[in-house]
Structure formats: structure tokens, C-alpha cells
């Protein structure tokens, strides 16, 4: 009887441990914003990491493996011209493809997320990314 209880306790502990290791992670749906408002999209999707003023110090920045860049300095770091195509590609494809030296893929790949707002149609998502890029371009330090 004593051995049966011991075996039961061991199996119970193994089952609990095994169950804890099979945690399922569900994605959170993206919040709908105006497709036309780059500012609204920035505040909803970018400010947590890049900061309210796009300087890189958002409340979630400390959780990132690589510190989010100051988005107001992109033009200054590119000879005075906002790197629109590169910025757009980073939003569309993520940093692993566009900036391999970036390190980890902390930043989401926004194309599929934004496409999900329009029944997975890519066209409206591309327009959203264009408007977001135009907004960030308007934030460049003079």
C-alpha cells in the first residue's frame, strides 16, 4: 500500500510538471485603428517600445533585447534624408530581413498583423504602413 501511494505521488507530480511545460501561448488580436491616421497607428502599435515622442524610451523598451531606436533621428543618421523605403521595409518585413545586425526579432512583422484588419487583404495594409511611415517622417528632428 505504501509503495502504491509513493508511485501515485510521483506520477501526480510528473503530470503536474509536464502540464506546466505545455503552456499554450495565444496571440492577442491587433486593435483596429484608422487606416488614414499614421499618428493613431503609431500611438497604438509603436509607442510602447519607441515612446510617445518616438525617442526610443517607451514603457516596454526595457523588455526588448535590443533597445528600440530613436525614430526622430533617422533622417539625421541618413545624411539628412528620411530613409522612407528602409523604414517601410522594416515595418513590412521586420528587422531580421532588413537589418541583420539588429539581433533578435523583437519588433513584430506588421504586414500580416495589419492585413488581418482587412480580411487578410494586403492592399489596405500597405496603405496603412505608408501612412505610418509618413507620420514617422514628420517627426524628424530639425
Features from the language model and the residues they span:
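Electrostatic cytochrome c docking/interface patches
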Residues: 18-41, 79
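Positively charged n-region of N-terminal signal peptides that target proteins for export
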Residues: 1-4
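Sequence context surrounding c-type heme c attachment/ligation sites in exported
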Residues: 36-44, 119-127, 141-142
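Short cysteine/histidine-rich zinc-coordinating motifs and their immediately flanking basic loops
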Residues: 59-63
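Sequence/structural segment immediately N-terminal to covalent heme-attachment motifs in c-type
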Residues: 31-55, 87
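Bacterial N-terminal signal peptides
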Residues: 7-15
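Extracytoplasmic electron-transfer domains, predominantly the class I c-type cytochrome c fold
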Residues: 65-121, 132, 136
